[in-house]
Amino acid sequence: MEQFEAISVEQAYLRWKEGKTALVDIRDPQSYEAGHAPGAFHLTNSSLHTFMQQTDFDQPVMVMCYHGNSSKGAAQYLLQQGFDVVYSIDGGFEAWARSYPQDITSESR
């Protein structure tokens, strides 16, 4: 895959439920801690190396941001780093929270 694929929040949710696709959240730490999809890896510049060590490059990766815009650049970057299949979630976390409020968790302090 040379180009990431944009997918709907519904498609992302189904892939997430199957458990075969890695989900990364690239929002700022405060937003991530306030609420994110369970199991989402908080991908930042400082956690990228860890993510790349822990994730098989042939495992599909979905990228979530706030609204589905920033995730496009991050998805393309992950492809350039060697991941085979990368998706950008249209609508981002805002669409996820609106459609699947029962599937949001927050960090306990």
UniProtKB/Swiss-Prot annotation:
The gene is glpE. Its EC number is 2.8.1.1. It is an enzyme of class 2 (transferase). This is Thiosulfate sulfurtransferase GlpE. GO terms for biological process: glycerol metabolic process. GO terms for molecular function: thiosulfate-cyanide sulfurtransferase activity. It catalyses: thiosulfate + hydrogen cyanide = thiocyanate + sulfite + 2 H(+); thiosulfate + [thioredoxin]-dithiol = [thioredoxin]-disulfide + hydrogen sulfide + sulfite + 2 H(+). Its main location: cytoplasm. It is found in: Cytoplasm. It comes from the Bacteria. Coiled coil: none annotated. Residues 17-105 form the Rhodanese domain. Keywords: Cytoplasm, Transferase. GO terms for cellular component: cytoplasm. Belongs to the GlpE family. The active site is at 65 (cysteine persulfide intermediate). InterPro entries: GlpE_sulfurtransferase, Rhodanese-like_dom, Rhodanese-like_dom_sf, Thiosulf_sulfurTrfase. Transferase that catalyzes the transfer of sulfur from thiosulfate to thiophilic acceptors such as cyanide or dithiols. May function in a CysM-independent thiosulfate assimilation pathway by catalyzing the conversion of thiosulfate to sulfite, which can then be used for L-cysteine biosynthesis. It comes from Yersinia pestis (strain Pestoides F). NCBIfam families: PRK00162.1.
